[in-house]
Amino acid sequence: MKKVLFLLLALLPALSAGAQSRFTKYLDQAEGAPFIVIDKQGFTLTLVDPQGEPIKEYGISCAINYGPKKVRGDHKTPEGTFKINELLNAKGLTHDFKDGKGPIKDAYGPWFLRLDVPGFWDIGIHGTPFPESIGTRATEGCIRLRNEDILDLKSRIKLGTVVIILPDPV
């Protein structure tokens, strides 16, 4: 019995280390505040607390093409660490998705959370008039959420929130 107890006590640090959140490895990039991790492969956006524990997970749509964004029009979502540098009320904004339907009103849902992606001023996290696209690769490069989810996310974040977009698998 003493041997079993000793073994359990010896393994306790290893077991507790394995129980850490999968997001703790990003804490050094998060600046001690809640942050966002976007998994393009899993079609998820996770809001994470300053200790690395998930607060809330949302379904997303990301760019049609795989890999990191390199040039305008490549239909790829950027990869890396960014910050939200603008919280734009997007009601009434239009966009032509070049699908033959012409300009779509409220194309970005209620909010557009602009990211500071070098060389690209028009990449962000936003809502959608196409909720059926969530869980698919359907965007020109942005991260798309259901409108109710972008409203919820916007209420939980602030200007300067760190956004980590994980790379596509190679």
Predicted regions and their residues:
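Positively charged n-region of N-terminal signal peptides that target proteins for export
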Residues: 1-4
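Hydrophobic h-region of N-terminal signal peptides that target proteins for export
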Residues: 9-17
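Intrinsically disordered, low-complexity
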Residues: 20-72, 79, 165-170
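Exported/periplasmic cell-wall-interacting domains
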Residues: 21-31, 74, 90-170
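Structural motif
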Residues: 42-44, 81, 112, 122
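Short beta-strand segments
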Residues: 56-58, 82, 121-123
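Generic structural signal for buried aliphatic residues
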Residues: 82-83, 163
